[in-house]
């Protein structure tokens, strides 16, 4: 919205500041943070009155019994803060921005339906139904990207540039390592965004854990989006150049700001949980940006904690079905460490530290080739 003021008055000194991505990213982050803080208190009171409270699993750690009754579905105000701030600070004429916003909202809707059914029917959506909806919206999103984005340009050397189709994947750590998957990119990309969304959902089991990890992931992809949208920087670093990618840095700043506002209420002891409406949407947002800036492979590194949490569940279920034995004390992984004697706060802080280390490692790939 503000960017339009610059376009309509590009000779104005006052509105000229809105053309800078850095300023708009800062504005988006602050705006989303403030909205999240203000709406948080309102939502917590509303959710408490309406009895939208979290049901704690009976077989979970004993320390979690005290969490029973904590209001959930707080992710709704995260999504509202992100959407409003993004519409205010991004270039709303960008089709890529709209695609990411609408995709994020579609996953928020899936999560909202799941959360709502937990209170109206005492059981959420069937896993099969939820997974089918996730795949449907992911397919739609990726097909839109494949139709809308012709491809990307990447410097191979100081004086040589090559064009690649959007269905190409860039391998980190290697120079000039680009593989065109063709139509195989469709299932690959769908797996990436659906996996990211469910990974965040499984990580959301301790106060502040998932939301803190999302802040780190968003911050990391802000850097990638900003660099990918800048012709000079992308050429120097020999990374894909995506003209509209810079606007996604503004969007992710809104994501980070909204998440920090939520963390204000979600830090231990949590006053509210985000529910599926928040976790599914946030994972989808990060995954969507990773696809567009052509850093899909690094999603495994940046979201390493999410991958570990998801894999712990898959391995636990597979092991029990095949051998009737469990690998972990409890899955997802964070519960295993709790039952191993770590306090909840220690698990959260240590997982955050791992997130930061993985983020720095991912950023190092900009130069390590």
Model-identified regions with their sequence ranges:
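Alpha-helical transmembrane segments
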Residues: 2-44, 80-109, 135-136, 141, ...
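Membrane-interface helix-loop junction between the first two transmembrane segments
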Residues: 38-59
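Membrane-interfacial helix termini and the short, flexible loops that connect transmembrane helices
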Residues: 47, 116-124, 270-271
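Alpha-helical transmembrane segments and immediately membrane-proximal extracytoplasmic
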Residues: 55-72, 95-96, 222, 232-236
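Juxtamembrane helix-capping/reentrant segments at transmembrane boundaries
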Residues: 57-70, 122-130, 134, 334, ...
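Divalent metal-coordination and catalytic microenvironments
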Residues: 74, 115, 276
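Conserved ATP-binding subdomain of kinase catalytic cores across diverse folds
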Residues: 111-113
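Membrane interface segments of multi-pass transport proteins and intramembrane proteases
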Residues: 118-127, 173-178
């Amino acid at each position: 919205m503000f960017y339009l003021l610059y376009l309509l008055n590009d000779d104005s000194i006052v509105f000229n500041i809105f053309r800078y991505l850095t300023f708009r990213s800062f504005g988006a982050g602050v705006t989303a943070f403030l909205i999240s803080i203000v709406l948080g208190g309102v939502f917590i009171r509303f959710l408490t009155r309406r009895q939208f409270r979290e049901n704690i699993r009976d077989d979970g750690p004993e320390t979690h019994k005290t969490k029973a009754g904590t209001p959930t579905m707080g992710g709704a105000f995260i999504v509202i803060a992100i959407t409003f701030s993004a519409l205010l600070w991004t270039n709303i004429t960008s089709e890529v921005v709209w695609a990411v916003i609408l995709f994020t909202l579609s996953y928020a809707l899936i999560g909202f339906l799941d959360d709502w059914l937990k209170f109206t029917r005492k059981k959420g959506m069937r896993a099969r139904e939820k997974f089918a909806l996730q795949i449907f919206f992911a397919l739609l999103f990726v097909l839109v990207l494949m139709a809308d984005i012709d491809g990307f340009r990447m410097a191979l050397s100081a004086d040589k540039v090559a064009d690649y189709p959007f269905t190409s994947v860039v391998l980190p750590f290697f120079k000039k390592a680009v593989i065109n998957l063709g139509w195989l990119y469709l299932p690959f990309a769908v797996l990436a965004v659906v996996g990211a969304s469910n990974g965040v959902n499984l990580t959301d089991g301790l106060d502040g854990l998932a939301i803190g990890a999302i802040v780190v992931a968003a911050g990391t992809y802000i850097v990638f989006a900003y660099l990918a949208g800048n012709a000079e920087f992308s050429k120097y670093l020999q990374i894909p150049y995506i003209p509209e990618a810079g606007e996604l840095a503004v969007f992710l700043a809104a994501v980070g700001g909204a998440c920090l506002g939520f963390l204000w209420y979600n830090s231990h002891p949590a006053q509210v949980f985000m529910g599926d409406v928040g976790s599914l949407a946030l994972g989808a947002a990060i995954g969507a940006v990773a696809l567009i800036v052509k850093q899909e492979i690094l999603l495994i590194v940046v979201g390493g904690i999410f991958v570990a949490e998801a894999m712990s569940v898959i391995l636990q279920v597979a092991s029990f079905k095949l051998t009737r034995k469990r690998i972990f004390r409890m899955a997802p992984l964070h519960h295993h460490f709790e039952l191993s004697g770590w306090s909840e706060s220690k698990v959260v802080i240590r997982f955050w530290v791992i997130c930061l280390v993985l983020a720095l490692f991912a950023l190092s790939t900009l130069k390590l080739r």
